[in-house]
Amino acid sequence: MHILTDYASDIKGMISYFDRIIVKGYNRQLCNSKQFGYFLGAQKILYKDYPTYAQEKTEELCKHIENIAAEQNRPSMFLRSSKVSKEETALKLLNESPVDSGLVCLISTVELCTAMGLEKNHKNGQLYVGSQNRKCKFYYLYFIDEEFGWMHFKIQTWFPFMVQIYINGREYLSKMLDKEHIGYTRYDNTFTHIDDIKRAQELTVKIESEKLSRIFDAMARKINCHCELIRNILGHEYYWCLSECEYATDIMFTTRQSLEAIYPSLVEHAFFSFSCEDIMSFFGRKVSGKGSQSFQGDIASDLRKRHKGIRIKHRMKSNQVKMYDKVSVLRIETTINDPHDFKIWKDTITKDGYHKKAWTPMGKSIANMYRYAQVSLAINMRYLNHLSVIYDKVTPIKMIERMSSTIETDNRKYSGFNILKEETIRLFEILSNGSFIIKGFTNMDIRKRLYTHEDITSAKVRNRTTRLIRKLIAHELVWKTPKSMRYHITVKGRKVIGHILYFIKKEYPEAFAFIQ
């Protein structure tokens, strides 16, 4: 069974592409103490004069960047605290001073950095320039770019002038769709509808890392006025690497209700059923025999309720895959922070000096962006396929037949559930509430939601609810937590209730309207 085929009538389609992309740029020569010394020597700058020289270059850079904003008549703002959201500040400035494209605003603040500073060798008393952890001024330039849409360019104002570029993959994809004249509907950074999904997915296959490098180089030259000087002396500019990369697979449902009918079951299954071995298999780790015992690292699952829905995340070391719902979209998203856990087929040099192709640990170079996409998509699809194991349409029918009939447990008879009765449907909707997945529910939780027009503190209502819970336990829909007054829905209960609610919502929406 597979979600995409079993619920095809409720699904518009699926699209996979990058979500958040953070690219860092740095000059490797400027980060090396000896080569930095060569850089200064080529300009006849003595080590003792470096602080003055560095201050001059910083002032030149700051003046140049501020002139860019002034020439384009765009707003600038200095944030006294680096903890203030630059994104929200930029959006506020955009709202106050609208622009369709180009530079939106310039934001500056003081943050921690790694800069090149003057140091003294205590053994021989000689001066040299080495990397230091300190604070310096950073500039954030926000753009509405023709190629990438909403993005920002961050630059450090002290040597070695490291930069960071943030791109929203969904913004990037929307620009591709605009060029192809493909219609779409977006909510935030999520596509809820795309007119031509097949063509849209074709656009995402070709990843031109060389083109991206050229675009980033052009941006850097425009913003960093020292690029030409650095290139003339050292022969290199910025080296671009992927600091953080999110790749998301979005399954677009026709309605929010269609997604809600199955999502609680998906979350519960993922949280309670996925083992460490399962999570390792998502990330492409072969688990057999003593395979899991040789793994060095930590694996964890985390469930969190957000204002937009429920998010579940599985982490292996620093890489992670998560699932969450957003409007009518089910998103499975992989974040690669450490690519060395994955392999890439590339040219290598043997000990004998020969060149040959081999699978080697993947690095962070932007040239490997295509491989990031391949690995992330494979993880997303393994996760989706594993979720599909719970969807069996035959077994729930037999379960529903049994729960609709009278049963006898411990010499006591319990009547069946009338699945079309209003009170039963209300009860099932309450039980399917995602907030009960972790902590479970109590007698009072059911009373407050089920008997809204009655005195829930009365013994009559309390006893009636107790009998109802016992009935749920007898039908194996609920289990009681030992030594507590809390209850949890069983996997069987989640499966049966999910199918009943899905059927009623889909086939008899007017009959279901009373609990909306």
Language-model segments: which ranges?
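Extended, non-transmembrane interaction/recognition domains
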Residues: 141-397
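Short acidic, hydrophobic short linear motifs in intrinsically disordered regions
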Residues: 437-452, 456
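Residue-level detection of the helix-turn-helix DNA-binding "recognition helix"
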Residues: 451, 470, 474, 498
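Long, contiguous, compositionally biased segments that the model treats as domain-scale units
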Residues: 1-257
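Short, amphipathic alpha-helical interaction segments positioned at domain boundaries
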Residues: 485, 491-516
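Short amphipathic alpha-helical interaction segments
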Residues: 456-474
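Short alpha-helical segments that sit at the start of domains
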Residues: 401-440
